[in-house]
Amino acid sequence: MAAKVEPFWMRKTLDQLDTQEWESLCDGCGLCCLQKLEDEEDNAVYYTRIACKLLDLKTCQCSDYANRRASVPDCIQLTPGQADEFKWLPPTCGYRLVSEGKDLPLWHHLVCGDRTAVHHERISQSGRMLSENNVAEDDWEDYLIFRAG
């Protein structure tokens, strides 16, 4: 009987992942593409229901991923070198979990084989977001959903 091989995310560090492995850690929840507000008093970061103009509100996928930085210059491109900064990501985020040495959740597509599980389990904000094109920036505080961290 062959020995069981641990999945790549449990046996490699973030720096050891190839591009395909790195990209596959994304669970497709779209939460990193929600607009965030920082509290000036305690520097806490709060997520809003306001999505980047490029985010598909149903699929939670970027509509122009390859060129996103051209139309959204402040789009954050996650890299393994930023792992110590991942605390602002949701606690369910594959990048954050792996950076913390934790396993992926059962609903993650790399575990269950179903890319829609993130929506069925209501981890994503699919169907519950608004496009930044439809909400004035001054009103974003009215759409806070949770505190990062």
UniProtKB/Swiss-Prot annotation:
Superkingdom of this entry's organism?
A: Bacteria
The organism is Pseudomonas syringae pv. syringae (strain B728a)
Q: Which family does it belong to?
A: Belongs to the UPF0260 family.
Checking NCBIfam families in the record gives: PRK05170.1-5, PRK05170.1-6, PRK05170.2-5
Pfam family of this protein, just one?
A: CxxCxxCC
Q: Which InterPro entries match?
A: Puta_zinc/iron-chelating_dom (IPR005358), UCP006173 (IPR008228)
Record's protein name: UPF0260 protein Psyr_1567
